[in-house]
Regions:
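Structural signature of beta-strand start/N-cap positions in the alpha/beta core
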Residues: 22, 48, 89-91, 116-117
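N-terminal cap/lid segment of alpha/beta-hydrolase-fold proteins
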Residues: 1-11
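Active-site acidic short loop of glycosyltransferases
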Residues: 18-20, 45, 86-88, 241-242
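Flexible "cap/lid" loop of the alpha/beta hydrolase fold
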Residues: 114-170
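Conserved HGGG/HGGXW glycine-rich cap/lid loop of the alpha/beta-hydrolase fold
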Residues: 10-64
Length: 252
């Protein structure tokens, strides 16, 4: 599996498999490229898949944190990858944070030129909520979402001397997981996932596995991105003149 050299000298891991028409898959926050295999591996004889592991996850877990915010950094990394396939147009599957990265690339770069068709899953074109746009991330629960993220940010700032979740004191680790559980419960209540997380939360030895990332500095970087994000990609999506499908909304 190849690693691609990024502008800052870090090596981004991209899972590649299959043969045929190229498909670029952009994962959501906390995902690793192998998690797509149950859905995509069966199509390997017809398509060649390219699935980057974002910095901090999977094969890119040891990449250093850049100075840019997470979405700008992801687009810079993705654009560097695309430069090595200058004449290639991909079927694009973009999920959650990966969809934000795709929209960012359409708005600020030439990502549209690399898109043959586009599947957009579970992401709003504008994360923030204001008087002009009520359909941001979590919509009417957006303020609650921001409070949870700020609580996690404050906790991480108070424990900046630690590198990993396992380095935290038991009480701090429990509080961190408690805040993450609140985030999970915000997504769908009631839900089987939330119930499973609640049971895991009650088991001390399982708590750290509830978190999508074990490095605290990366966790802080990603969360800060969602706290600060003010981009509006609606005009970018209007520019997209390729076949596109959107799975988005409360019941998607």
């Amino acid at each position: 599996m190849p690693h691609y050299l990024m502008p800052d000298g870090e090596k981004l891991y991209v899972r590649e498999f299959g043969q045929g028409t190229p498909v670029l898959v952009l994962s959501g926050l906390g995902m690793q490229s192998w998690q797509w295999l149950p859905f995509l591996y069966q199509h390997r004889k017809k398509y060649r898949f390219y699935i980057p592991d974002w910095r901090g996850f999977g094969g890119s877990a040891q990449c250093k944190i850049p100075t840019l915010d997470a979405i700008s950094s992801h687009w810079q990394d993705l654009n560097c990858f695309l430069n090595q396939y200058a004449d290639t147009a991909f079927h694009v599957i973009a999920y959650s944070m990966g969809a934000t990265t795709a929209m960012h690339g359409i708005q600020y770069g030439h990502f549209k030129d690399h898109i043959r068709s586009y599947l957009h899953i579970d992401q709003t074109p504008k994360i923030s909520v204001d008087a002009d746009w009520l359909h941001g991330l979590f919509a009417e629960k957006h303020a609650d979402f921001k409070v949870i993220l700020q609580n996690i940010t404050d906790l991480l700032a108070q424990n900046a001397q630690y590198r990993l979740v396992s380095d935290l004191t038991a009480s701090m680790r429990t509080e961190l997981v408690k805040q993450w559980l609140a985030f999970i419960q915000l997504q769908a209540t009631p839900s089987r996932t939330a119930a499973l997380f609640q049971k895991a939360f009650q088991q001390i030895h399982l708590q750290k596995f509830m978190l999508p990332i074990q490095r605290l500095d990366y966790m802080a970087w990603y969360i800060q991105n969602y706290l600060d994000h003010q981009e509006d990609y609606r005009n970018a999506l209007r520019q997209l003149d390729r076949p596109a499908t959107f799975f988005i909304g409360e019941d998607s």
